[in-house]
Each structure stands twice: as structure tokens, then as C-alpha cells.
């Protein structure tokens, strides 16, 4: 009794009439002929179930999104290239930066330069210091410079293609090679120092004598002071008349009677002279004069033999200022 009811319920739920054998065979032949040309993508009207329809839609969306992203990326790349060409930008390249060690730094070639000065027109040259120049090549390209207080040697070190055809002077050649290393370093730092303020002036050497009895107090030695002045007459007028020491001008560098141009960097020349004289001379301790009440400093007590050496030092640095800063 239960079997007919079950069969009857199944037949009702299908809602389709049972086809005959001939029509069913015709449908099978038609489906087999169309399945060769139709695929899952172009059978939009085929009823494949709820889950299969969502998968189809998701695949279509993925294809559309991928095509849109690919098109936009191509357009962005073309726009970046056009903008780089129009603005002359360099494209950003990412390179791997390796940390440098001491061996790699020492193995890499370094470019060392030096600045030299032309004696004729005052032009500056930046030369690459790579290897020593052949003396024959040096003498053939640089004319000899004959001046009284110019250093006798020109230790120019440069590449052969960068040597100028005129006379040049290296700053280290002005330093006395017999000085100590400490004094050489002090002079080199002073030569390389770019002063924010300096003015033309003269290097004046004053001689001091005690008014009461100079020969008894000093004997064969003499008290001198080396300082820069811009107006010599004003310095002589401002010296106190009631001082226990009388002051007179021993010599002026450069000589105003022979040249109309003073020393262009008088403060620098004064410091250079004082630093070099500190090597072999001792300065007197500053003291306050009992008569005039002024402070006397930067005084040297020398003899006649030491004066020739001091004069040569002053002449050399005054000549340096004339050659370099003329």
C-alpha cells in the first residue's frame, strides 16, 4: 500500500510529464550535438544550480577586475615615462648598498686636490694630486720665478695634463722645512684658515729703550715688538709720552717708500710671524708699566744676530701675502 503513494509523490514533485521513448532519444541527440560547441562560459541560460551560478559570476568579475587593473597600470606607466621625459627626471633605481669596510675604502682610488696660485695674474688652479711630476717636464712647463724672498723650491705634484703654463706657488713651500712638526701644523692650519675679516696694513717693528739708562739695563740685547698697523702716524701719536720706555720704528714691512700697496692680509701675516717665532724665541711676559699704567705685551728681547733671522721671517710672510693676495 505504501509503494504507490511514494511513486505518486515523486511524479507530482517533478512537475514534468514523462516523455516517450522517441522524444527522449531526440533530446539526447540534440544535446550531444550542441555540447560540442557550447561551453560553461557561453551557456548563460543553462540551469546549473545555485552554487554554480555564483562561481560563474565570480570568475567573470575576476576577469574584469584583472583587465581593468592591467589597463590602468599600463596607462600609469606611460604617464610616468612622459612626465619623466618632459621634466627631465631620472627614473628611480633601487640598488643594493653594501657596507664599506676599511679594505674597500683603501682600495678605492681617491681624488686629492690642491690649490695653487698664479704669480702673474693671481688666478687660482685646482690640481689633482695623483703622482709626482717629472722634473724635466716641470721645468719645461713652468717658467722660473726669480724673486728675492720666494722659496727656492716648487714641489708641485699634479697630473701632467693639468699643469698650467704659468708660474705657480704651493702654499706648503712657504713653510720652513727645519721647523718642528707641531709648528708646521700650526702654520698649515693658519694658511688654510679663511678669515671672515682682514684688512690691509703694515707689519711694523718697534724698538723700545728705557729712558733712564738703556745700555745698563739691556746690555747688548734689544727690546722689539712686532705688530700690524693700519695708520703708522696715529700709532705713534697714541703712544703715551710718560712711559718708562721710549718707542721708535725699527723697520716697516713692506717699505712705504718702495711700494704703494700695503700688506693685504695684515692680521694673517702677523699671526704667521708670531707662530713661527714661537719656535725658537721666547716672548716676554706681559707686564704693566708703572709710569704710564698701560699693558706691554708681545715683546721680544733679542740680540743683533737674531734680528737678521727675524727679518727674514717677516720678509717671507709679507712676500707670501703679496704673491697670493695681490
Curated annotation (Swiss-Prot):
Pfam family, one: T5orf172
Source organism of the structure: Schizosaccharomyces pombe (strain 972 / ATCC 24843)
GO molecular function: catalytic activity
PANTHER family: MEIOTICALLY UP-REGULATED GENE 113 PROTEIN
GO cellular component, one term: cytoplasm
InterPro entries hit by this protein: Meiosis_regulatory, Phage_T5_Orf172_DNA-bd
Encoding gene, per UniProt annotation: mug113
Function: Has a role in meiosis.
Name assigned to this protein: Meiotically up-regulated gene 113 protein
GO biological process annotation, one example: meiotic cell cycle
Subcellular compartments: Cytoplasm
Keywords in alphabetical order: Cytoplasm, Meiosis
TM region(s), chain numbering: none
Amino acid at each position: 500500500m505504501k509503494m504507490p503513494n511514494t511513486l505518486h509523490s515523486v511524479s507530482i514533485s517533478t512537475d514534468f510529464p514523462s516523455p516517450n521513448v522517441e522524444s527522449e532519444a531526440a533530446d539526447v541527440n540534440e544535446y550531444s550535438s550542441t555540447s560540442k560547441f557550447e561551453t560553461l562560459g557561453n551557456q548563460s541560460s543553462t540551469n546549473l544550480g545555485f552554487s554554480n551560478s555564483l562561481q560563474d559570476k565570480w570568475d567573470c568579475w575576476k576577469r574584469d577586475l584583472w583587465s581593468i587593473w592591467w589597463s590602468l597600470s599600463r596607462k600609469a606607466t606611460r604617464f610616468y615615462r612622459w612626465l619623466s621625459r618632459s621634466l627631465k627626471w631620472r627614473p628611480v633605481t633601487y640598488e643594493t648598498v653594501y657596507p664599506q669596510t676599511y679594505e674597500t675604502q683603501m682600495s678605492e682610488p681617491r681624488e686629492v686636490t690642491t690649490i695653487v696660485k698664479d704669480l702673474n695674474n693671481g688666478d687660482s688652479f685646482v690640481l689633482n694630486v695623483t703622482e709626482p711630476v717629472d722634473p724635466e717636464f716641470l721645468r719645461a712647463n713652468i717658467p722660473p720665478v726669480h724673486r728675492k724672498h720666494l722659496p727656492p723650491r716648487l714641489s708641485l705634484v699634479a697630473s701632467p695634463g693639468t699643469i698650467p703654463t704659468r708660474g705657480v706657488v704651493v702654499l706648503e713651500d712657504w713653510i720652513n722645512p727645519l721647523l718642528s712638526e707641531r709648528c708646521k701644523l700650526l702654520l698649515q692650519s693658519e694658511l688654510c684658515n679663511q678669515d671672515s675679516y682682514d684688512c690691509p696694513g703694515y707689519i711694523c717693528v718697534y724698538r723700545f729703550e728705557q729712558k733712564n739708562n738703556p745700555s745698563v739695563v739691556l746690555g747688548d740685547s734689544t727690546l722689539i715688538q712686532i705688530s700690524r698697523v693700519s695708520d703708522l702716524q696715529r700709532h705713534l701719536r697714541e703712544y703715551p709720552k710718560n712711559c718708562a720706555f721710549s718707542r721708535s720704528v725699527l723697520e716697516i714691512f713692506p717699505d712705504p717708500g718702495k711700494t704703494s700697496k700695503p700688506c693685504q692680509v695684515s692680521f694673517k701675516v702677523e699671526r704667521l710671524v708670531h707662530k713661527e717665532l714661537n719656535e725658537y724665541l721666547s716672548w716676554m711676559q706681559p707686564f704693566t708699566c708703572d709710569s704710564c699704567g698701560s699693558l706691554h705685551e708681545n715683546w721680544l728681547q733679542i740680540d743683533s744676530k737674531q734680528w737678521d733671522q727675524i727679518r727674514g721671517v717677516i720678509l717671507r710672510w709679507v712676500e707670501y701675502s703679496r704673491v697670493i693676495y695681490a
